[in-house]
């Protein structure tokens, strides 16, 4: 019976020690990512910026600083109308923030941006695929995006339902008016 007590004590000791060790490693990793992110933000030499960005997003891909860098890069590329490269960055962000221990907020932002860009590029099936995770979503904008993608693939009946869901959930009258225009546009083609 002494063996069992010693075994339990050892297991608990190793578990607690392992937990604190992993937390320390995680803390050090976040601190290193923070330094890289801050350096990336202030560096003006393009080659240095790119090297810092690659280091941050490849070696610290599961940190919030890497997610922020990818979000900023993807958004900047989209503003410059470099949609193909932008969507690649958002796919990387989606992959890095996905999963059980991922960041669902960042993942949702990445998916929304992928869908928006896919629709702009005419890749409606890709938009639907990336939004599939949100099949029961309560967000009005997600319903609107699904409606846009469904319209693009010619499924006007489902698009109309998505637009109606968006219309019901939007609180802002300007957004409601925009969705109402989309609904009216679909109804004129019936």
Describe the residue ranges of each PLM region:
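Alpha-helical adaptor scaffolds
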Residues: 71-141
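Short solvent-exposed coil/turn linkers within tandem alpha-helical repeat scaffolds
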Residues: 4, 58-66, 95-107, 133-142, ...
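TPR/TPR-like (Sel1-like) alpha-helical repeat modules
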Residues: 90-95, 136, 156-174, 184
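Single-pass alpha-helical transmembrane signal-anchor segments
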Residues: 1-24
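Alpha-helical segment of the N-proximal tetratricopeptide repeat
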Residues: 31-64, 72, 76-79
């Amino acid at each position: 019976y002494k063996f069992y007590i010693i075994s339990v004590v050892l297991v608990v000791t190793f578990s607690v020690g392992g937990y604190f060790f992993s937390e320390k490693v995680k803390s050090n990793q976040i601190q290193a990512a923070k330094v890289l992110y801050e350096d990336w933000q202030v560096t003006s030499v393009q080659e240095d910026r790119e090297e810092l960005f690659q280091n941050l997003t490849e070696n610290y891909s599961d940190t919030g600083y890497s997610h922020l860098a990818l979000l900023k890069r993807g958004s900047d590329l989209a503003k410059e109308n470099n949609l193909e490269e932008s969507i690649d960055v958002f796919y990387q962000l989606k992959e890095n923030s996905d999963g059980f221990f991922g960041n669902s907020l960042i993942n949702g932002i990445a998916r929304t941006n992928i869908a928006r860009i896919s629709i702009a590029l005419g890749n409606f099936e890709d938009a639907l695929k990336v939004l599939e995770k949100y099949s029961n979503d309560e967000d009005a904008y997600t319903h609107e995006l699904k409606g846009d993608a469904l319209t693009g693939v010619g499924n006007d009946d489902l698009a109309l339902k998505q637009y109606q869901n968006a219309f019901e959930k939007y609180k802002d009258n300007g957004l409601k008016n925009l969705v109402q225009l989309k609904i009216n546009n679909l109804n004129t083609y019936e």
